Design a protein with these regions (language model features):
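Secretory targeting and sorting signals
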Residues: 3-29
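Detector for C-terminal structural segments
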Residues: 39, 228, 232, 329-356, ...
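Surface-exposed binding/hinge segments that line
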Residues: 42, 111-113, 130-132, 139-204
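Alpha-helical secondary-structure segments
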Residues: 48, 126-136, 177-183, 220-221, ...
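N-terminal lobe/hinge region of extracytoplasmic solute-binding protein
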Residues: 50-105, 217
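Gly/Pro-rich hinge or "lid" segments in bacterial periplasmic/extracellular proteins
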Residues: 82-87, 187-250, 254, 368, ...
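Short helices/loops that flank or line small-molecule/ion binding pockets
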Residues: 123-125, 130, 264-275, 291, ...
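Ligand-site clamp/hinge motif
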Residues: 206-213, 240-288, 411
Length: 545
């Protein structure tokens, strides 16, 4: 997920390594206590969080890690993930479904049955047909995740002329029996994990296809209220929520979330006692201060930060220019500049936590060679606009990148966009964005979430495109399509993915530079702190003293 940004009983689940270290805490503020429910002895009043941005609070539209961090506790899917720390958080478990599905031997037919008595936060009953409406709604509104569901029989045809009354033939529901049957046109090894994406969260059948930020009823432990675009939103308890052994009620009664793009300001809010938690990229010169005035958790997760180069736009339509950029970047220095070294320099698309990962070292830091390649490509003096978003670490990285492009002979300038519109702008074909900053946090732990979503030319769309490099290559596209059918990540399959990655990076549509370690900053009055590998800090399990 870039934007962000995960599982399964029928295919191998990778045990991604996670390492977190909780550091010393000092001064905080008084806890906001609530009356403790005998059903939940750790319940408390208000959790005050500060994050940098969201894109949407609409399950069929949202596609950033920050949005999903909140929405995971508002919208439930047929299958979901456990609220637990460590690798067990990658295990798929029933969500709205009463059990894991039955799957046909050919891997094409999936049968589910909903739990009894499910209701949305507005009190209306959950129907089996609401699942099909959620998928259709994504196509009707050109949602960012519709490409995940085109392997459902009839979905491709529906996508060409979507109408509210149209039908996706591969989805058959029975409201009276609470059953959902999904038939695929072709087997897809990661389909169960795709069903756990929030894009597939059922919504009431009368939900308007247009974007509905924070107003769509959900089935999770919380519901949204008081959404103020680009400023804040609030989460309160859903009175109709039915907890399961996998999905808890949640500890905070209310979650107040402020949207603050300036990392220094976000850090100061926690130090001052205005917020209990911040996920901002703490400025390097403030890390020591943060350790002394709160609790700092260093969270490792699967992510890659990179600069994309649009292969359709000059000068990046020339391979030598893209290779020059990769040689020019000092990845270690950039990581130190942006995060004080909290991360791991990389030249790979995949994070090192994946069994498909094979470390690449194609582009050693060599500015002289980069300049030579620019000259050989006839690109000296070419005008380039670097795109980034208005968040502290992205701006710093964008400034560095712009200076490097100028250093090797290009004529580059920086364009900083508002946080909320950045991805939709660079993902629009009419923008003709040449190059810029991006990151990807896994949606689910499978190479398809990286190569199919981000670098498969068959998935390019004119709007809300995730392939910012607009990279299309017949050879690697065909390999990705073939690997979709592999149900298990065997050593042989992992080796095939490693080959695809090397072939792509030899064509250099990206300049990957870091697998970041995330600093999560808490005030002293927070006690139990828990993480979930896919969704980050698990707000439902946080506690106050």
């Amino acid at each position: 997920m870039g934007r962000k940004r995960h599982w399964r009983p029928l295919v191998s689940v990778m045990a991604l390594a996670t390492g977190v270290s909780l550091m010393v805490a000092a001064h905080g503020v008084a806890a906001n206590r609530a009356k403790v429910s005998p059903k939940n002895p750790q319940a408390f009043g208000t959790l005050r969080a500060v994050i940098d941005t969201i894109d949407y609070l609409d399950p069929q539209q949202a596609y950033t890690g920050q949005s999903w961090w909140a929405m995971w506790n508002v919208y439930e899917t047929l299958l979901t993930y456990r609220h637990v720390d460590g690798p067990a958080g990658y295990k798929l478990v029933p969500g709205l479904a009463q059990s894991l599905p039955t799957v046909s031997r050919n891997g094409k037919v999936y049968k589910f049955k909903l739990r009894k008595g499910l209701k949305y936060s507005n009190g209306s009953a959950v129907k089996a047909s609401d699942f099909e409406w959620a998928i259709k709604r994504g196509f009707l509104a050109t949602g960012q995740g519709v490409g995940f569901y085109t392997d459902i029989a009839g979905a491709e045809a529906y996508s060409k002329n979507p109408t509210p009354g149209g039908d996706i033939s591969g989805i058959v529901t029975n409201n009276a029996k609470r059953t959902i049957t999904i038939r695929l046109a072709t087997p897809r090894g990661d389909f169960l994990t795709i069903l756990a994406l929030l894009f597939a969260a059922p919504v009431p059948g009368n939900t308007d296809p247009a974007i509905q930020n924070g107003s769509i009823p959900g089935t999770g432990p919380y519901k949204f209220s008081n959404y103020d675009p680009n400023r804040s939103f609030t989460m309160v308890r859903n009175p109709y929520f039915k907890p399961t052994k996998y999905i808890p009620r949640g500890n905070p009664n209310t979650v107040e979330v402020a949207l603050v793009g300036d990392a220094d300001a976000a850090t100061q809010r926690v130090i001052n006692g205005q917020s209990d938690y911040s996920n901002a990229a703490i400025p390097p010169d403030r890390i020591a201060d943060a350790k002394g005035k709160g609790k700092l958790l260093l969270r490792k997760t699967a992510n890659t930060y990179y600069f994309w180069m649009n292969v359709r736009e000059a000068p990046f339509n020339k391979l030598k220019v893209r290779q020059a950029v990769n040689y020019a970047i000092d990845r270690k220095a950039l990581q130190t500049l942006v995060w004080g070294g909290l991360g791991r320099p990389t030249q790979n698309v995949l994070p090192p936590t994946y069994p498909s990962y094979r470390k690449l070292a194609l582009y050693g830091h060599n500015v002289t060679k980069a300049k030579q390649l620019i000259n050989q490509a006839g690109a000296s003096g070419a005008k380039v606009t670097v795109w980034t978003r208005n968040v502290s670490d992205a701006v710093t990285a964008g400034q560095y990148y712009t200076s490097i492009l100028n250093q090797i002979g290009l004529n580059a300038s920086l364009n900083v966009l508002p946080r909320a519109t950045y991805y939709t702008t660079i993902g629009n074909v009419n923008t003709h964005a040449q190059t810029g900053w991006a990151r990807w946090l896994e949606d689910y732990p499978h190479p398809l979430d990286w190569f199919d979503v981000l670098l498969n030319g068959n998935r390019i769309t004119d709007q809300d495109n995730n392939n910012f490099a607009w990279y299309k290559n017949k050879k690697t596209d065909a390999q990705i399509e073939s690997l979709k059918k592999a149900p298990i990540l065997t050593p042989a399959v992992n080796a095939r993915w490693a080959k695809v990655e090397k072939q792509i990076m030899e064509r250099a549509p990206w300049a990957p530079w870091s697998n970041r370690v995330f600093p999560e900053f808490f005030s002293k009055n927070m006690s139990c702190i828990h993480t979930q590998l896919l969704y980050g800090i698990d707000l439902a399990r946080l506690c106050k003293k």
